[in-house]
Curated annotation (Swiss-Prot):
InterPro entries: Aldolase_TIM, GMP_reductase, GMPR, IMP_DH/GMP_Rdtase_CS, IMP_DH_GMPRt. GO terms for biological process: purine nucleotide metabolic process. This is GMP reductase. GO terms for cellular component: cytosol; GMP reductase complex. It comes from Salmonella paratyphi B (strain ATCC BAA-1250 / SPB7). CDD domains: IMPDH.
Length: 347
């Protein structure tokens, strides 16, 4: 047993210090980035935000809507090959450019992903997702995926420490997914006592990944556009959003009605709701590590996407970053004990 004395921080613990700026307008800020990935050699340009691979977020409908904003969608792994084929037949090449194919690490997952990727060469992203990216089996699966798909861009996670980021990048991952427990419907931290404050995880993992020519995506912990800006400021190359994109027309959750008001169900992918839906219930040897919430219907996701991108542009103007790429270089975090004036929050 050992105790690390260093203070670890989440998004709520900091604000970004404003700096002099020569920008005249938020419209002067360029949010699009261009990346060439370490292993695949592929080049991609777009806004580096990803809709999470949850079945109440990462839907085909979400991918269609967010592609119009140049945003990626990690489509959840529970669609069948036939459903993928139907989607590809109606989707444009521009939409497919903004799609990640998600998979688990079982043999069945691998075989299904092989079939999906064979449907269209425009599917260039694979998202290998497990709750705990620290297992030897997971590292071996990433290496297997790299061997099978040498020209596909592979995103793999989740982990929260630099040495594991390095391990995954050396095993074939182009992008490492960072985050254990920060999600809005994740209960891993309270069920297991395991986790890592998200901002510190991003800063440390970005440092490790960039040293090897890899990249990271900050997955979880964002509750507002300012948190997205903080994740990019901390060094994240991409930011993945779940709860912020849930509850919309494109989100895919079941709609329930209470007292004349309609709500959409949103749940974590390790929740009892998810396991009942996809694997026939919670196995006797495990506990559910997610919760189910009812969200008021939020309308089309486009309005939320515009709000997030507008907040991100504004953050860049406050620190003088004319491009999103410059935000991390111009970010100075200050530790705080309050984020906002809450006097009217209950109204």
């Amino acid at each position: 047993m050992r105790i690390e004395e260093d203070l670890k921080l989440g998004f709520k613990d900091v604000l970004i210090r404003p700096k002099r700026s020569t920008l005249k307008s938020r419209s002067d800020v360029e949010l699009e980035r261009q990346f060439t990935f370490k292993h695949s050699g592929q080049t991609w340009s777009g806004v580096p935000i990803i809709a999470a691979n949850m079945d109440t977020v990462g839907t085909f409908e979400m991918a269609q809507a967010l592609a119009g904003f140049d945003i990626l969608t990690a489509v959840h792994k529970h669609y069948t090959v036939e459903e993928w084929a139907a989607f590809i037949n109606t989707a444009s090449a521009d939409v497919l450019k903004h799609v990640m194919v998600s998979t688990g690490t079982s043999d069945a997952d691998f075989e299904k992903t092989v079939q999906i990727l064979a449907l269209d060469p425009a599917l260039n992203f694979v998202c290998i997702d497990v709750a705990n990216g620290y297992s030897e089996h997971f590292v071996q699966f990433v290496a297997k995926a790299r061997e099978a798909w040498p020209t596909k861009t592979i995103c793999a996670g989740n982990v929260v420490t630099g040495e594991m980021c390095e391990e995954l990048i050396l095993s074939g991952a182009d992008i490492v997914k960072v985050g254990i427990g920060p999600g809005s419907v994740c209960t891993t931290r309270v069920k297991t006592g395991v986790g890592y404050p998200q901002l510190s995880a991003v800063i440390e993992c970005a440092d490790a990944a960039h040293g090897l020519g890899g990249m990271i995506v900050s997955d979880g912990g964002c509750t507002m556009p300012g948190d997205v800006a903080k994740a990019f400021g901390g060094g994240a190359d991409f930011v993945m959003l779940g709860g912020m994109l849930a509850g919309h027309e494109e989100s895919g959750g079941s709609v329930v009605e209470e007292n004349g008001e309609k709500f959409m169900l949103f749940y974590g992918m390790s929740s009892e709701s998810a396991m009942n839906r996809h694997v026939g219930g919670v196995a006797k040897y495990r506990a559910a590590e997610g919760k189910t919430v009812k969200l008021p219907l939020r309308g089309p996701v486009g309005n939320t996407a515009r709000d997030i991108l507008g907040g991100l542009r504004s953050a860049c103007t406050y620190v003088g970053a004319s491009r999103l790429k410059e935000l991390t270089k111009r970010t100075t975090f200050i530790r705080v004990q309050e984020q906002e004036n809450r006097i009217f929050n209950s109204l």
